[in-house]
């Protein structure tokens, strides 16, 4: 519930998800602009496009903000030959937090989640890496300001 989120928790989540992307892009911008070329890919989330499965307001809000930052940077950097896009993963068991979330669902909740995904499987880190590599490639040279949902068709 929103009443349970401390200001500190809110700020930590925004720092990790929005501030980090902003300051990394800011640091890379001069060299990319001088080169007239660059690729920036942010990792947002399905929670940046719709309500979060976690119910954590700060996480969903930060991921929505990251999508907005991605689109704004694409607008600003485009004239300099720099593309900016975002990969929005669905549920991937890739770290202790996602593993705890998965375990909290229990067998029935896990089954419901997998059945809500059109491909009937959870994503893998490789699924996310492949989408990211696409945005970094020349094949995506005329794509900017876009968010690619990598969620097995759940969105």
Regions found by a protein language model. Give the residues of each.
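Substrate-binding pocket helix/loop in short-chain dehydrogenase/reductase
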Residues: 1-2, 9-11, 102, 109, ...
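Alpha-helical segment proximal to the catalytic Tyr-Lys
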Residues: 30, 75-76, 141
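Short, flexible catalytic-loop segment of classical short-chain dehydrogenase/reductase
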Residues: 49, 88-100
């Amino acid at each position: 519930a929103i009443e349970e989120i401390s200001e500190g928790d809110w700020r930590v989540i925004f720092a990790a998800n929005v501030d980090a992307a902003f300051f990394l892009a800011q640091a890379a911008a001069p060299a990319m602009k001088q080169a007239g070329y660059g690729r920036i890919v942010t990792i947002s989330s399905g929670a940046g496009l719709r309500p979060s499965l976690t119910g954590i307001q700060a996480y969903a809000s930060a991921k929505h903000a990251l999508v907005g930052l991605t689109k704004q940077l694409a607008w600003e950097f485009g004239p300099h030959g720099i593309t900016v896009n975002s990969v929005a993963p669905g549920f991937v068991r890739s770290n202790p937090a996602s593993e705890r979330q998965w375990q909290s669902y229990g067998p029935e909740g896990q089954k419901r989640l997998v059945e809500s995904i059109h491909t009937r499987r959870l994503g893998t880190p490789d699924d996310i890496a492949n989408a990211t590599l696409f945005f970094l490639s020349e094949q995506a040279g005329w794509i900017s300001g876009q968010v690619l949902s990598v969620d097995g068709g759940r969105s």
